[in-house]
Amino acid sequence: LVFVPTLEDAERLSRRLAQIGNLNADGRPILGLDSRDLLEIMLECAHGSVMIPAHVWTPWFALFGSKSGFDRLEDCYGDLSEHIFALETGLSSDPAMNRLISRLDGYALVSNSDAHSGANLGREANLFAGRPSYAGMFAALRASAKRQDQSALDCRFLGTMEFYPDEGKYHLDGHRACNVVLEPKDSLALGNICSVCGKPMT
């Protein structure tokens, strides 16, 4: 998720990214770009911009996905890791599940619906109280990441509104084409190979 404070910043960032990839493909940009480099471009284009890695557990391309190549946020964002203070959990997990992983303790956890799935818009959301503003919202998330008292802030982060994680596509392992659904321990016992067709599972 990329946030910039003004429309002018958004236009500047869009122009820069259009030189790198396709911004019009099916509602989601296709960029041949590492996440760290996208963060650097965003920071250069817009003062006050914020990046929140989204759907962090999705297997294929997400920050902590099994196929991403990263085990830690620092492996992905390198020298710019300090600019990441929040993570979006995705539909297949919720903040309570993520809080079981101590390395995520220093991050605010947010939940969002997919903007490219209009029928499901709003099934997950972030709850704020107080006077909404761009700066206020991110100040509240930064305070939440540091476990600081938010009572003096104009805008406070209260938490998230969650759908049922077990309804998420990636809550359990499996192979959709073969209608196979397994607990992770059972997938590991099978070497993450579908027992029906012999192909890798997600």
What are these regions (language model features)?
Residues 35:
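Active-site-adjacent beta->alpha loops and helix N-cap segments on the catalytic face
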Residues 53-57:
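Short, well-ordered beta-to-alpha junction loops that form the rim of enzyme active sites
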Residues 39-46:
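Active-site acidic/histidine clusters and adjacent loop/turn architecture
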Residues 49-50:
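Short, structured loop/turn "capping" segments at alpha-beta junctions
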Residues 28-31:
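Noncatalytic, typically N-terminal accessory segments of nucleic acid-processing enzymes
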